[in-house]
Amino acid sequence: MSTTPTSAPETTQTDVLIVGAGPVGLFAAFQAGVLGLKCEIVDVLDRAGGQCTELYPEKPIYDIPAVPGCLAQDLVDRLLEQCAPFAFPMHFSQRAESVSDTTCTNGHPRLLVTTDAGKRFDVAAVLICAGAGAFAPQRVSLPEAAALEDRHLHYAVRDLSRFAGKRVIVAGGGDSALDWAMALRKTAARVTLLHRREGFRAADHTVKAMRDAVAAGEMDFVVGMLGGLQTNGDGALTGAVVKSRDGEQTIPADDLVALYGLVSEPGPIAQWDMDMRAGRIAVDTTTYESSRRGIFAAGDIAFYPNKQKLILSGFHEAALALRKAYHYAFPEKSLVHVHTSNNAALKERLTHG
């Protein structure tokens, strides 16, 4: 009896693999294109945008240079538009699992990266823009919760209009929970903010605004913890059982938005033989290269003294990292800096696609 041998996974060869499709990863892709580098992007989420898309797409951002203010999702959309002329492939719902050293035909060092979906990338450099690492929202730990996810139980607000006319419970005590409770009160039929104690892990002005809204009868605030979720015969949410020192009560609800924060960890990259500091990658600030040749980090995942966790800092880090990555991709060529406005071919590509 003969069998057909299983073929080895196809290996994609490119200059740079960018791990993470958040704002920093998207800007890095644009920078790669400007420099003449080919790149591909891998992200554990199912779409581009990182935390901006997954957790707070409608949250205002005010600290991007030359952009007085925009929503987080708008920033992602603009970055996608900016890098679109280069048409870099993006691979979603998979994470970079392992890396090994290899060489190309001329003997120059390369890296072989494999994802948990079996994709393989032969690259000159890896730029990790994975934010806080692989992350997921902290989920409601009730047995009935899983069946309600995406229909009535949400871990992010992606569209305020989705909750129009609904009774909504927002659970959590951080800035995100308070911000969304305040925003939803203008759309939902009724909003109840649920937190386990009177104190909050949020900015003072946000807490004051919430308490003022409660005092004005615009929303409710309940101290307690989720003890159960109630559904009707169709499996739709009808209410939440809340436990407190005073006993139990049932709060009617059509939707529950649970904003307990994120569970994040570096994931497999922590085993990539790099100097790690508290789950982040230590880098040389002249190039943002890690302790392992050819692997760079930019954005929140990068560690160095006086590091500022700002999107604009990540843009700067990615730009410098890619200039060093260029020398790994083209070791026998010099990178000549040319302003995009003075490069006719590049200008044509960026303006007309």
Swiss-Prot record:
InterPro entries: FAD/NAD-bd_sf, FAD/NAD-binding_dom, Fd--NADP_Rdtase_type_2, Ferredoxin-NADP_redctase_2. One of its GO terms (molecular function) is NADP binding. Keywords: FAD, Flavoprotein, NADP, Oxidoreductase. FAD binds at D43, Q51, Y56, A96, F135, D300, S341. Its cofactor is FAD. Binds 1 FAD per subunit. It catalyses: 2 reduced [2Fe-2S]-[ferredoxin] + NADP(+) + H(+) = 2 oxidized [2Fe-2S]-[ferredoxin] + NADPH. Its EC number is 1.18.1.2. Homodimer. Belongs to the ferredoxin--NADP reductase type 2 family. This is Ferredoxin--NADP reductase 1. It comes from Cupriavidus metallidurans (strain ATCC 43123 / DSM 2839 / NBRC 102507 / CH34) (Ralstonia metallidurans).
